[in-house]
């Protein structure tokens, strides 16, 4: 009787937490690896990447390479020693003497970078309604590459950012596409905007897509938040009943108790859902 549990324990598969598939680091692969990390530290990403920026600020600009290696798009580059080898060839980045950390050779002017955000938004479109219901977290890196290839056929772009649901962190079917120039962005919008029925239909895997400016997307998102969390509608979508704010009761009037909304509870709840 005592042998069976022991046998089952021996047959239990080993953890794959630290396992990886070794890839051949050809010159092309080394170059892609380097460009990916340089992008993380670029003016297009670093000022807006809170995690990366705060990590660097705490360490005089340095970020552990082991941390960067955990990013989804970097997990395929193993062993990490090859990543370090690629980074040592960078003209933008500097690797520490012990090979443990990396930082920009010339720090970014974050104030100027933040001021450039307005211009960046003018070059950015939101493309919505991508198939996403069956997309697992493990499929995100491959999907990212596929969507980048999809948009590169349609215009000159800097980056494609997949939006995620703040509750489950899964891809929500919307991507933000940043074009290299405002004219490129405007040309794409003119060709595929849903405002003009004569425009060409933009689709992906047979599904019609919707195209909005970044400003339209932000306004739509704020309107959705207001609808879901305003005191007037009190819908609180996605919340269990036990998590709803409790409103203090007023004195009885005409034999009935009236409730008064606690606006601070609603504001706190809305703040919790900011991305």
Swiss-Prot record:
GO terms for molecular function: mRNA binding; RNA binding; tRNA binding; U6 snRNA binding. Residues 222-275 are annotated as: Disordered. GO terms for cellular component: nucleolus; nucleoplasm; nucleus; ribonucleoprotein complex. Residues 226-236 have a biased composition (Polar residues). SUPFAM superfamilies: RNA-binding domain, RBD, Winged helix' DNA-binding domain. GO terms for biological process: tRNA processing. Molecular chaperone that binds nascent RNA polymerase III transcripts, stabilizing these RNAs against exonucleases. Required for the 3' endonucleolytic cleavage that matures tRNA precursors and for efficient folding of certain pre-tRNAs. Cooperates with GCD14 in the maturation of a subset of RNA polymerase III transcripts. Functions also in the assembly of certain RNA polymerase II-transcribed RNAs into RNPs. Binds and stabilizes newly synthesized U6 snRNA as well as precursors of U3 snRNA from degradation. Facilitates efficient Sm protein binding, thus assisting formation of the U4/U6 snRNP. Interacts with SXM1. This is La protein homolog. The gene is LHP1.
């Amino acid at each position: 009787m005592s042998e069976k549990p022991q046998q089952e324990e021996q047959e239990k598969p080993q953890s794959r937490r630290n396992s990886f598939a070794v890839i051949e680091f050809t010159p092309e692969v080394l170059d892609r690896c380097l460009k990916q990390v340089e992008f993380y530290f670029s003016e297009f990403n670093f000022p807006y990447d809170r995690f990366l920026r705060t990590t660097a600020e705490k360490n005089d600009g340095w970020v552990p390479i082991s941390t960067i290696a955990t990013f989804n798009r970097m997990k395929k580059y193993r062993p990490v020693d090859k990543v370090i080898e690629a980074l040592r060839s960078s003209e933008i980045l500097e690797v520490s003497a012990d090979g443990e950390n990396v930082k920009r050779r010339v720090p970014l002017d974050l104030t100027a970078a933040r001021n450039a955000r307005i211009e960046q938004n003018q070059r950015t479109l939101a493309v919505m309604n991508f198939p996403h219901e069956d997309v697992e977290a493990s499929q995100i890196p491959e999907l990212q590459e596929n969507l980048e290839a999809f948009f590169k056929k349609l215009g000159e772009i800097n980056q494609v950012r997949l939006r995620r649901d703040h509750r489950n962190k899964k891809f929500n079917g919307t991507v933000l596409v940043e074009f290299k120039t405002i004219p490129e962005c405007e040309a794409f919008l003119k060709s595929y905007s849903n405002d003009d029925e004569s425009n060409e239909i933009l689709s992906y895997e047979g599904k019609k897509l919707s195209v909005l400016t970044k400003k339209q997307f932000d306004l739509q998102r704020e309107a959705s938040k207001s609808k879901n969390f305003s005191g007037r509608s009190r819908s609180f979508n996605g919340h269990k009943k036990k998590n709803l704010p409790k409103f203090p009761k007023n004195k009885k009037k005409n034999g009935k108790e009236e409730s008064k909304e606690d606006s601070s509870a609603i504001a706190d709840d809305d703040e919790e859902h900011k991305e």
